[in-house]
Amino acid sequence: MDAAHWHQGLGLVKPMEEMLMAANAAAGANPNPAATAPSSVTGGALRGGGGGGAPPVAGGAGAGSTERRARPQKEKALNCPRCNSTNTKFCYYNNYSLQQPRYFCKTCRRYWTEGGSLRNVPVGGGSRKNKRSSSSAASASPASASTANSVVTSASMSMSMASTGGGASKNPKLVHEGAQDLNLAFPHHGGLQAPGEFPAFPSLESSSVCNPGGPMGTNGRGGGALSAMELLRSTGCYMPLQVPMQMPAEYATPGFALGEFRAPPPPPQSSQSLLGFSLDAHGSVGGPSAAGFGSSAGLQGVPESTGRLLFPFEDLKPTVSSGTGGGGASGGGAGVDGGHQFDHGKEQQAGGGGGGPGGHDTPGFWNGMIGGGSGTSW
């Protein structure tokens, strides 16, 4: 451009800025005629200013800005076509097309589009609430089913426990304790009978063979804690201790081979043991002789009601002189009834004669003592 046309160019630039400002103000007041205003002004400017390259470019930029300003602005809230409520909003992110804008009514929770129909199905928060309620109902139904199953299982378990317990009339303790009683083989306290799971094992307390006529036989099953002691006190079923037997003086000589096996003579009745109490109280029924033999006196036919302890209390008694022991032994042999071996020894001492040394028939004597000819249980 020549220097002569600079002033014209400057003159064109200043009026163009003023025209653009005026066009913007007019577009804000009335958007409809704003599109035609720049064209007339630009045409007048072009006619007054003559030819130039810049004015057409400025005119095109003004037309684009006015078109951008010509877009429809946000309108006020529309009334809902269903409930006629103004609590509506324009959906910016849920529109399919700007030609048919979409709106949402917050009151009746319905969508509608301009120029379209109203949707009858509620969407949004309402559907979520419905889904939550349905899911809660679905979760509640399995819970109720599991509760019913647990009730049925508990009932079946209780029925099985009652059936395996053998009936509540026989032993109701099993039902209350859940059939977990580990002491089924022993009698229960309170007189309850044990279940008949062990019919082949008779009761030791109620047995008439071990203790005939005793208090435990009459009472049936007694206390379970004393069953072991009564078992030890029984006198007819088990092998007792070695019975001290009286032997002649000839067999006690040092030259005789069996003299060292002779039992010590029995002590007197009022003897004191190493434990500090008398051990002869168990044999007071048969007199001094029965007391001297201690627990083995019951084997010779002496009537007993409670039995004798089978503990080796004879070892705890102090030793007695041979003279006193001999008198006690002779008295013991005379006082015991039914002791055939003691009667036999007494007769041999009284006779003082016979075959063999000391007037005794040695084979017959030992056969009677060891072979069971006298009827004594060994």
Swiss-Prot record:
The keyword Acyltransferase does not apply. A zinc finger (Dof-type) spans 78-132. Residues 28-79, 116-148, 203-222, 316-378 are annotated as: Disordered. Residues 45-63, 323-338, 350-361, 369-378 have a biased composition (Gly residues). Zn(2+) binds at residues 80, 83, 105, 108. It holds the Pfam family Zn_ribbon_Dof. It comes from the Eukaryota. GO terms for molecular function: DNA binding; DNA-binding transcription factor activity; zinc ion binding. The keyword Phosphoprotein does not apply. Residues 66-77 have a biased composition (Basic and acidic residues). PROSITE patterns: ZF_DOF_1 (PS01361), ZF_DOF_2 (PS50884). It is found in: Nucleus. GO terms for cellular component: nucleus. Transcription factor that may transactivate seed storage protein genes in developing seeds. This is Dof zinc finger protein 1. The gene is DOF1.
